[in-house]
Amino acid sequence: MDDQTRHTRPLTGRVTIPTDMDVVPQTLEIMKRWGADAIRDCDGTDFPQQLRDTGAKVYATYYTTRKDNAWAKAHPEEVQQCYIMTGFYTAQEGPLAIPLMKGISPELMQVNTRDDIRRWWEVVDRSTGKPIPPEAWRYDAESGCVILDAPEAYHEYTVSFLAYLIWDPVHMYDAVTNGWKDFEHQITFDVRQPKTHAFTMERLRRFIREHDYVDVLRFTTFFHQFTLVFDEHCREKYVDWYGYSASVSPYILGQFE
């Protein structure tokens, strides 16, 4: 090959272009300019035919823990969960009511009363550091509060409880950040639980069969949820992109006993 041919022939390879459903023309233009040999999606939707016809490799995002609300709604007991601790509440004379969801978006989480709260919840006297016996407190579903009928006056108390993640935290983050409107909240589901595990394996096989144009699956969120907590006004309250604390349940905890 002479020098002129070497310098004039278009070079391709080792460049992957992210794309989305509403930027197809721009994607094609950048592919040509940069000599990209692969395309990856940003939102997990099907690729437009125009992009499939480019001959480039297709990298498709695949979500194992969401994007099937029909399944999640049919099996609410296998929705992902996390532990939440309330703020500190000071007892006065008489009963103390501790609201569980204060400071937490009701769109994001829902209190789990399906599993035995006496076993999986904990009320702690923070002034002494000692847990309160289950028979000394009760949960009032109507008010959403844990009630201590006879607390120690001027002692501080907290409640730790399980909550379902009824809106995938990352999906909520994307929606809030980008100002999305008129869309369905994606519900999480726990792929480690028996029914969802079997469903997930079949769902993956079906996706592969039905998307033969995809060269590489880009798995995102294998089984855990990032710990992203929003308040009632959808403001970020706690953000941890590295932790796994939003991936717990009585079923999983039982595996460690």
Can you name each region flagged by the protein language model?
Residues 1-257:
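Glycan-processing catalytic domains of CAZymes
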